[in-house]
C-alpha cells in the first residue's frame, strides 16, 4: 500500500456528505534528535 492510498482511505472515512473534511490528522515523529539534549 502506498502512502497516498493511506491518506485516501482516511479522507473517505472522515469526509462529510458533501465531501469536505472536518477532521485534521497530525502525525508526530517525536522530538528532533538534533535539538534534544542527550540523556546523561
Swiss-Prot record:
Its main location: cytoplasm. One of its GO terms (molecular function) is hydrolase activity, acting on carbon-nitrogen (but not peptide) bonds. Disulfide bonds: none annotated. It is found in: Cytoplasm. The keyword Cytoplasm applies. Its EC number is 3.5.1.-. The active site is at residue 28. Belongs to the polysaccharide deacetylase family. This is Chitooligosaccharide deacetylase. It comes from Bradyrhizobium sp. (strain NC92). The lineage of its organism: Bacteria, Pseudomonadati, Pseudomonadota, Alphaproteobacteria, Hyphomicrobiales.
Amino acid at each position: 500500500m502506498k502512502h497516498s492510498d493511506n491518506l485516501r482511505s482516511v479522507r473517505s472515512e472522515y469526509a462529510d456528505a458533501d465531501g469536505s473534511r472536518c477532521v485534521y490528522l497530525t502525525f508526530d515523529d517525536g522530538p528532533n534528535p538534533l535539538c534534544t539534549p542527550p540523556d546523561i
